[in-house]
Amino acid sequence: MDKIVVQGGDNRLVGSVTIEGAKNAVLPLLAATILASEGKTVLQNVPILSDVFIMNQVVGGLNAKVDFDEEAHLVKVDATGDITEEAPYKYVSKMRASIVVLGPILARVGHAKVSMPGGCTIGSRPIDLHLKGLEAMGVKISQTAGYIEAKAERLHGAHIYMDFPSVGATQNLMMAATLADGVTVIENAAREPEIVDLAILLNEMGAKVKGAGTETITITGVEKLHGTTHNVVQDRIEAGTFMVAAAMTGGDVLIRDAVWEHNRPLIAKLLEMGVEVIEEDEGIRVRSQLENLKAVHVKTLPHPGFPTDMQAQFTALMTVAKGESTMVETVFENRFQHLEEMRRMGLHSEIIRDTARIVGGQPLQGAEVLSTDLRASAALILTGLVAQGETVVGKLVHLDRGYYGFHEKLAQLGAKIQRIEANDEDE
């Protein structure tokens, strides 16, 4: 497995960077292609990520024809044949997001067998909200030998209230409801931009989805869906990561194609911290002077709150802001593992239950560290930019799940960073 080596201490980032299509959007979009019994579905602006390759394999394993043109960032899916009911364990077990094929398979076939999902080990991440919602739509569910088995002679509309606005559950239920009899109403639904993007695709395929982006989504079932062409929304988390990178290096970076509206919670905290954030025609510009950075208090919340997927990167930014900052993680448990690695670099921090206290403005030293999950890997690399000396980040399998060419983009902005091959025993 490769490693990333950062020469820290003088890495002011300057220039522009272009953002990819959203990883958190494209995975459910790929699952939705299963619903099209007529015509091909073409997804454009698809990021080249390991998770995308896995989801392509999951969809292909269901007897759909999948063609990924990496050079064109385009995926074509033909799901007009007979869709199989079982999502292959060897693929589903690798990635948590693959559970979103459950709803589409049920809608197309009436029965499904899907392995319990894998992926990042962040907290318990239960899938009970997915299952409770499907049961309300007439699905009978059993769990045996690591598999979820679900059957429904015919899905019917239901009024579903979710105890928590789960993104994955909202997506699964939306897709299942598109071909159900009657009307489905999802209350306390997730409101993320990726939910809106999925609704746009489904409607382009002939579905009747209203209210995406609000707390209440209404889906009126239709007889069938057809293929279409759809452009994947830009990745707000990648955009946010580069906004933080510019801020913590005292840089001046234009993040091309970044959407201001999608990044409002992050932008609000950057402004509060003393960072200059400007909306431009081509994207979002971030300028920073390190001596102006102030400590802040941040709490992660479901959208439109501060995104949990930016928590690790923002704690990296807190290390260079003078004073004591706090980060409260309310969405996932056990998501401060990266701070243990940062302590190897000299970070002064304390974790009490769901709250991390970060003492910023202290000198950091480069060290060998291991990424513990996707966003932690980015946070450790960013911390390496501002630490004195050399930082080596291992376990890049996490990074490759959600960032395309991350080190190359940083290098183009002026970072002293490279990716090297490493022997397995070095990990």
UniProtKB/Swiss-Prot annotation:
Predominant location: cytoplasm
2-(S-cysteinyl)pyruvic acid O-phosphothioketal modification, residue list: C120
Annotated residues for binding of phosphoenolpyruvate: K23, N24
Active site (catalytic residues): C120 (proton donor)
Keywords in alphabetical order: Cell cycle, Cell division, Cell shape, Cell wall biogenesis/degradation, Cytoplasm, Peptidoglycan synthesis, Pyruvate, Transferase
A single GO cellular-component term on record: cytoplasm
CDD domains hit by this protein: UdpNAET (cd01555)
MF GO annotations: UDP-N-acetylglucosamine 1-carboxyvinyltransferase activity
Pathway: Cell wall biogenesis; peptidoglycan biosynthesis
Keyword tRNA processing: no
E.C. code: 2.5.1.7
Record family assignment: Belongs to the EPSP synthase family. MurA subfamily.
Chain's role: Cell wall formation. Adds enolpyruvyl to UDP-N-acetylglucosamine.
The protein's name in its UniProt record: UDP-N-acetylglucosamine 1-carboxyvinyltransferase 1
Source organism of the structure: Streptococcus pneumoniae (strain ATCC BAA-255 / R6)
